[in-house]
Amino acid sequence: MKFFALTTLLAATASALPTSHPVQELEARQLGGGTTRNDLTNGNSASCADVIFIYARGSTETGNLGTLGPSIASKLESAFGRDGVWIQGVGGAYRATLGDNSLPRGTSSAAIREMLGLFQQANTKCPDATLIAGGYSQGAALGAASVEDLDSAIRDKIAGTVLFGYTKNLQNHGRIPNFPADRTKVFCNTGDLVCTGSLIIAAPHLTYGPDARGPAPEFLIEKVRAVRGSA
């Protein structure tokens, strides 16, 4: 897979999109707005949340939650309470640059170390917390690589993971290596070419908003409650 395919298609997407997806909306989803949350890194171990959600945004997205993360966070907070869940985006060494998509694991080694560090910090700071995770596009590859590389003792604390537009979906057979399939939910739209082994960005790759507002957080909530009970 060549990096030029990704950059060329990003430039060409506007002229090729169906009229049902306005160019401005799609550009905003791929390149625009985002929110930053650092509840884990800023939080006090004396007041740990019961649940910690660690999320990796897609390429070029701003903040550390990007475009989809805030919707998931909102639904999680509705379910568990504002103090019952900590929301943590992956920032720091994870730059979410386009070129890193072409690396063997779909992101950089530095980014993987960054997300691993957040899982490790969650385990050290809040050892009784239930962990959940997610990622979009390059962030999905990052989430998968990080979970795969975790020490098994920490990995076993992850109740569920959601991946959108998973760039390593084909290579990893629709799952996360070394992680239970029943704790993984992959969202790959029909026509999203990155889910079939390409780095070509087509319109379906940019339309995961409804999944982030509904099925994805609902899956995570279900998995957390299976571990912690319905309270």
UniProtKB/Swiss-Prot annotation:
Catalytic activity, EC: 3.1.1.74
Keyword field contains Nuclease: no
One GO MF term: cutinase activity
Disulfide links within the chain: C48-C126, C188-C195
Highest rank taxon of the organism: Eukaryota
InterPro entries: AB_hydrolase_fold, Cutinase/axe, CUTINASE_1, CUTINASE_2, Cutinase_monf
Gene3D superfamilies: alpha/beta hydrolase
Record site feature (Transition state stabilizer), residues: S59, Q138
A cellular component term, taken from the record's GO annotations: extracellular region
GO biological-process terms attached to the record: carbohydrate catabolic process
Primary localization class, coarse: secreted
Keywords, sorted A to Z: Disulfide bond, Hydrolase, Secreted, Serine esterase, Signal, Virulence
Family annotation (Pfam families): Cutinase (PF01083)
Signal peptide per UniProt: 1-16
SMART domains named in the record: Cutinase
Catalytic activity: cutin + H2O = cutin monomers
Post-translation changes: The 2 disulfide bonds play a critical role in holding the catalytic residues in juxta-position; reduction of the disulfide bridges results in the complete inactivation of the enzyme.
Active site, UniProt feature: S137 (nucleophile), D192, H205 (proton donor/acceptor)
Localization terms from the record: Secreted
Family according to the record: Belongs to the cutinase family.
Protein name, UniProt field: Cutinase 2
Organism taxonomic ancestry: Eukaryota, Fungi, Dikarya, Ascomycota, Pezizomycotina
Gene: CUT2
